[in-house]
Curated annotation (Swiss-Prot):
The gene is BCA1. The keyword Chloroplast applies. SMART domains: Pro_CA. The modification Phosphoserine is found at residues 175, 266. Gene3D superfamilies: Carbonic anhydrase. The modification N-acetylalanine is found at residue 114. This is Beta carbonic anhydrase 1, chloroplastic. It comes from Arabidopsis thaliana. One of its GO terms (cellular component) is chloroplast stroma. SUPFAM superfamilies: beta-carbonic anhydrase, cab. Homohexamer.
Length: 347
């Protein structure tokens, strides 16, 4: 068995016949919960002694294209006016001018009737600004102002117990699905909830998030959640991935979980495309869990017992949620390929 060291220690699989406590066991223990211009001047650095020392034309960066000037053409502060303030203003007016009570009562009746009937002719076109405004007003009134203790603590800092990788799909917000409260989870959302392997250059954004969550926030759990009818996984299963990309970013991104596609094709090659996608949605989660092991600080947390990895799957069609975990241990010999074998996908 070929082995490859991973930052001073190794990973290996545990065969059925082996029971040594020194061996690593990394397996999915199914626990199901059902809920219905760089410059090239260096190459020509030799200069004549008669030349004058070059100077900058201006002491600021020069770009190939001017930076865009971005200025908001409107701005509105939200949450400063609310229903209660309007009611108080009306009460004050009626106290000062009692003769308006009859007129006010009639107006209130008209407003009430209009709100109750709500005919289709009264419906307005979708207003994105008003939707955001009303959404914040509702949040502030029903949640922020009713829980000052929670938001008071959050003003001091955050200490989430979870780091969650979830899909950007608008139907699967993890805070709604799992009823997370503000401060509970440090969330990263992207296409198909994928975690790329450790790479300081190519995937720095994801790496920075994992590093911050593990080393600074001290999260205790990293959860990767897949979901039903995932467009990213459908793309992974559909794209030829032969180097002739038809997209600027998507195909290169979903290649992260190409091992999951390979496994599904080898095992379900004759099955319907929808069934293949459903299987790949779960297998891609396992690929991401394995990729998390390539981050040194994640492995360190697993060894110390301060961090746990979990996989999840949300079926919003059936209203069900699956959760599984990974067990981790130390071994004297291991290889990256062994990790792949344990998770049942091919490198």
């Amino acid at each position: 068995m070929s082995t490859a060291p991973l930052s001073g220690f190794f990973l290996t699989s545990l065969s059925p016949s082996q029971s040594s406590l020194q061996k690593l066991s990394l397996r999915t223990s199914s626990t199901v919960a059902c809920l219905p211009p760089a410059s090239s001047s260096s190459s020509s650095s030799s200069s004549s002694s008669s030349r004058s020392v070059p100077t900058l034309i201006r002491n600021e960066p020069v770009f190939a294209a001017p930076a865009p000037i971005i200025a908001p053409y409107w701005s509105e502060e939200m949450g400063t006016e609310a229903y209660d303030e309007a009611i108080e203003a009306l009460k004050k007016l009626l106290i000062e001018k009692e003769e308006l009570k009859t007129v006010a009562a009639a107006k209130v009746e008209q407003i009430t009737a209009a709100l109750q009937t709500g005919t289709s002719s009264d419906k307005k076109a979708f207003d994105p600004v008003e939707t955001i405004k009303q959404g914040f007003i509702k949040f502030k009134k029903e949640k922020y102002e009713t829980n000052p203790a929670l938001y008071g603590e959050l003003a001091k800092g955050q200490s989430p117990k979870y780091m969650v990788f979830a899909c950007s799909d608008s139907r699967v917000c993890p805070s709604h699905v799992l009823d997370f409260q503000p401060g509970d989870a440090f969330v990263v959302r992207n296409i198909a909830n994928m975690v790329p392997p450790f790479d300081k250059v190519k995937y720095g954004g994801v790496g920075a998030a994992i590093e911050y969550a593990v080393l600074h926030l001290k999260v205790e759990n990293i959860v990767v959640i897949g979901h039903s009818a995932c467009g990213g996984i459908k793309g992974l299963m559909s794209f030829p991935l032969d180097g002739n990309n038809s997209t600027d970013f998507i195909e290169d991104w979903v290649k992260i979980c190409l091992p999951a596609k390979s496994k599904v094709i080898s095992e379900l090659g004759d099955s319907a495309f929808e069934d293949q996608c459903g299987r790949c949605e779960r297998e891609a989660v396992n690929v991401s869990l394995a990729n998390l092991l390539t981050y040194p600080f994640v492995r360190e947390g697993l060894v110390k017992g301060t961090l746990a990895l979990k996989g999840g799957y949300y079926d919003f069609v059936k209203g069900a949620f699956e959760l599984w975990g990974l067990e981790f241990g130390l071994s004297e010999t291991s290889s990256v390929k062994d990790v792949a074998t344990i998770l049942h996908w091919k490198l």
